[in-house]
């Protein structure tokens, strides 16, 4: 069989396939991506396509939402330059999802909120372009100074962030065990102990994995096993400082609380807007 015969036949409909709707700059500037996980742009801007029907269905699949798989598949579909979204730095996730929503539904997002004063259901429009610009203006701080050490950190990957979200569910399971009146006290203690150990180990491993290098008065330490051992054996204040720095860096670029006024009673209140994909992509402006 000739090479011409085995080549994939070009689709005459390809000229009507999706085209990029917008271009987005990533807050990380393309840093912190492992080799092969990002097709780096020379301009720093990446094409963003609107979601397909399949992409929208992904955000309606509970199991895929819970595991993070839906987010991974949609980012791969709509921002193909990000070839392995599991390894993308967490500081790029919100920017990517906002850009995808803009490309799919437009620059404004309609949200609803009940007034805490009169219970009136209000509707507001959020300017996502303004939001995206504010995210891109933010810079990640890669060093934590704990004299005489300097801890060099990287942001969570999306995989690690998903594991952190699952950790929250594990917390809930622990509380459910404690409040389960049908279980004996011995069973409660045993299951609580196992869950707590699992949760603690996951937390420590994720934080240790975000430490790329430690600068000491005697030089730099980059060996990951040695860094893991240090994190596991460091004083609590050292661990808490590193953990808080990494977490704060992520929270600093999350969608800010909106200060709004009720359309009925005119009183003002704070309205949180989340990046929970199940509602972020369900509400169209």
Regions found by a protein language model. Name each.
Residues 1-285:
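Long C-terminal interaction/binding lobes of large macromolecular proteins
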């Amino acid at each position: 069989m000739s090479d011409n015969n085995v080549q994939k036949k070009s689709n005459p409909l390809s000229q009507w396939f999706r085209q990029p709707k917008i271009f987005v700059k990533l807050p990380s500037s393309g840093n912190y991506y492992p080799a092969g996980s990002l097709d780096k742009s020379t301009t720093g801007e990446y094409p963003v396509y609107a979601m397909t029907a399949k992409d929208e269905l992904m955000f309606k699949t509970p199991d895929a939402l819970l595991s993070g798989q839906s987010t991974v598949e949609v980012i791969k579909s709509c921002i193909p330059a990000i070839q392995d979204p599991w390894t993308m730095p967490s500081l790029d996730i919100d920017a990517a999802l906002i850009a995808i929503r803009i490309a799919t539904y437009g620059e404004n997002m309609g949200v609803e909120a009940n007034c805490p004063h009169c219970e009136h259901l209000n509707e507001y429009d959020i300017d996502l372009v303004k939001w995206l610009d504010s995210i891109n203006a933010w810079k990640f701080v890669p060093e934590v100074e704990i004299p005489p050490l300097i801890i060099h950190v990287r942001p969570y990957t999306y995989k690690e962030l998903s594991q952190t979200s699952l950790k929250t569910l594990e917390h809930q399971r622990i509380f459910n065990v404690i409040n389960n009146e049908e279980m004996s006290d011995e069973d409660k203690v045993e299951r609580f102990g196992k869950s707590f150990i699992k949760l603690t180990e996951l937390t420590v491993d994720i934080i240790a994995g975000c430490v790329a290098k430690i600068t000491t008065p005697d030089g730099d330490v980059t060996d990951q096993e040695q860094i893991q051992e240090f994190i596991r054996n460091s004083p609590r204040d050292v661990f808490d400082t590193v953990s808080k720095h990494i977490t704060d860096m992520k929270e600093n670029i999350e969608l800010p609380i909106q200060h709004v006024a009720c359309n009925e009673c005119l009183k003002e209140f704070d309205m949180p807007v989340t990046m929970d994909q199940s509602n972020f992509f369900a509400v169209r402006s």
